From Swiss-Prot:
This is 2,3-bisphosphoglycerate-independent phosphoglycerate mutase. The lineage of its organism: Archaea, Methanobacteriati, Methanobacteriota, Stenosarchaea group, Methanomicrobia. It catalyses: (2R)-2-phosphoglycerate = (2R)-3-phosphoglycerate. SUPFAM superfamilies: Alkaline phosphatase-like. Pathway: Carbohydrate degradation; glycolysis; pyruvate from D-glyceraldehyde 3-phosphate: step 3/5. It is an enzyme of class 5 (isomerase). HAMAP family: ApgM_A (MF_01402_A). Its EC number is 5.4.2.12. Pfam families: Metalloenzyme, PhosphMutase. One of its GO terms (molecular function) is metal ion binding.
Length: 398
C-alpha cells in the first residue's frame, strides 16, 4: 500500500456573504477532492488539541501522527531544523518575520511577500548590526527567518504572531513577560537599521511594502521526536516550500524533498510538487505534500486568491496524484484535508475541526458524499477524529 497525505493549508473557512453564504470549499471548483469524498469516506479532524495554539506547527504535527501534547516545543525549532541550524540544549529559537509597520501598526506580516534574495541581504545586515554572542540571525525563505538566543534567553517571553494582529497597534502586542522588554527593544532597534536600507528604499520606489521591522514569535527549544518509521513501520517523505513542514520531516527522520520553484505562495511550482510526490512513492511508503497558498490568501483576506489557491491545489496537486493512484499497479490510500481553517473574515487561524476525506483504490465502499467541504464532512461516517490518530488508522486499516 502507498499513502499520499495532501494538505491544503488553511483551506477550511466560514460561510461568506459575497459567496452566497458558501464557504471557499463549497464555492470552489474541486472535482478531484469531490471525487475522493464521493468514492471514499469523510469526517472531521480535530487538528488543534485543547490548550495549544492554532498554528500550522501544531496542526501539521498532528496530521503527521505526532501528538503535539507530547512532542510540541514551539514553532521556530522546527524551522531551525529545516534550515540546518543545530540547537544547543540552552538555545531558544524564534521565528523572525520581516514585516511592514506603518503609523505604529502592522500593515503587512509578510513585507509584501518579500523575495528571499532581498530578505537575505536584510537579515545579514541585521546580524552584523544587532547580532552578538547571545543573538544570531539566520536567513530563511521570503519573510520567514530565524533568531537564535543563547542561555535560554526568551524561553518564557510572551510573543504574539504578527498575522494575528494585522492593522493593530504594535505597542499593545510587543513581547511581554520575562525578558519581554529586551525583545521589544530589539524590534525597535531593527526599525532603525532597516528604515533607510537600500533594499527598502528600492522597494518603496517600486510601490512595494518595505521590510522595515522584524517581529519575533513562536520560540522554543529543540524537541525530541520518535522516528516516523519506528512509530508506524513505514518510510516517508515530506514535500513543502515551508521550513516549518520541512523541520517536522527532519525531526521525524523522513526524507525532505526539495522542489525547485516551490515558493509557499500562489506562484508555487504545483506541477513540480505533484511529480516529486509520484516519484518518491516509487521508493517510499508515504508522502506528505503540503501547499501553503490557501493559508496565505486567507491571511490576506482575499476571496479571489483563496478560491484560486484551492482550485489550483485541487487541479494541480490532488488531480494528478489521484490519476496516478487509480492507474497504479499498487493499492493507494489518499488522505486530503486542510491543517486548520484560515477564515477570510478573521484573516488568521481558527481552531475548528477540519473536513478530511480518505480514498482507497482497493475499496468500493464509500459515503457517496456530494462534495468535499465542511458541511458534507459533518455527515460523514468517520465522525470526529483526533488528527494525530489519522496516520495510525490509515496504516493499520485492512
Amino acid at each position: 500500500m502507498k499513502y499520499a497525505v495532501l494538505i491544503g493549508d488553511g483551506m477550511a473557512d466560514y460561510p461568506i456573504d459575497k459567496l452566497g453564504g458558501k464557504t471557499i470549499l463549497q464555492a470552489a471548483q474541486t472535482p478531484a477532492m469531490d471525487y475522493i469524498a464521493a468514492h471514499g469516506k469523510i469526517g472531521l479532524a480535530k487538528t488543534i488539541p485543547d490548550g495549544l495554539p492554532a498554528g500550522s506547527d501544531v496542526a501539521n504535527m498532528s496530521i503527521l501522527g505526532y501528538d503535539p501534547a507530547v512532542y510540541y516545543s514551539g514553532r521556530a525549532p522546527l524551522e531551525a531544523a529545516s534550515m540546518g541550524v543545530a540547537l544547543a540544549s540552552d538555545d531558544v529559537a524564534f521565528r523572525c518575520n520581516l514585516v511592514t509597520i506603518e503609523h505604529g501598526r502592522i500593515k503587512d506580516y509578510s513585507a509584501g511577500h518579500i523575495s528571499s534574495e532581498e530578505a537575505r541581504i536584510l537579515i545579514e545586515t541585521l546580524d552584523a548590526e544587532l547580532g552578538n554572542e547571545e543573538l544570531s540571525f539566520y536567513p530563511g525563505i521570503s519573510y520567514r527567518h530565524l533568531l537564535i538566543a543563547k542561555d535560554n534567553l526568551g524561553a518564557e517571553t510572551e510573543c504574539t504572531p504578527p498575522h494575528d494582529i494585522t492593522g493593530k497597534k504594535i505597542e499593545e502586542y510587543l513581547p511581554g513577560g520575562k525578558e519581554g522588554d529586551f525583545f521589544s527593544d530589539l524590534i525597535k532597534k531593527s526599525m532603525i537599521v532597516l528604515e533607510l536600507h537600500p533594499v527598502n528604499l528600492r522597494r518603496i520606489e517600486e510601490g512595494k511594502n518595505p521590510a522595515n521591522s522584524i517581529w519575533v514569535w513562536g520560540q522554543g527549544s529543540a524537541p525530541k521526536f520518535t522516528p516516523f518509521r519506528e512509530l508506524y513501520e513505514k518510510t516517508g517523505a515530506v514535500i513543502s516550500a515551508v521550513d516549518l513542514l520541512k523541520g517536522i520531516g527532519v525531526y521525524a527522520g523522513m526524507d525532505v524533498i526539495e522542489v525547485q520553484g516551490a515558493t509557499g505562495y500562489l506562484d508555487t511550482n504545483y506541477e513540480g510538487k505533484a511529480s516529486a510526490a509520484i516519484e518518491v512513492l516509487k521508493t517510499r511508503d508515504l508522502v506528505f505534500v503540503h501547499v501553503e497558498a490557501p493559508d496565505e490568501a486567507g491571511h490576506e483576506g482575499s476571496i479571489d486568491k483563496k478560491l484560486k489557491a484551492v482550485e489550483d491545489f485541487d487541479s494541480r496537486i490532488v488531480a494528478p496524484i489521484l490519476k496516478h493512484a487509480k492507474t497504479s499497479d499498487e493499492p493507494f490510500t489518499i488522505l486530503v484535508l486542510p491543517d486548520h481553517p484560515t477564515p477570510i473574515s478573521i484573516k488568521t487561524h481558527a481552531r475548528d475541526p477540519v473536513p478530511f476525506a480518505v480514498y482507497r483504490t482497493d475499496k468500493t465502499d464509500s459515503d457517496s458524499a456530494e462534495a468535499f467541504d465542511e458541511e458534507s464532512a459533518k455527515k460523514g461516517s468517520l465522525g470526529l477524529v483526533k488528527a494525530s490518530d489519522l496516520i495510525g488508522i490509515l496504516v493499520k486499516a485492512k
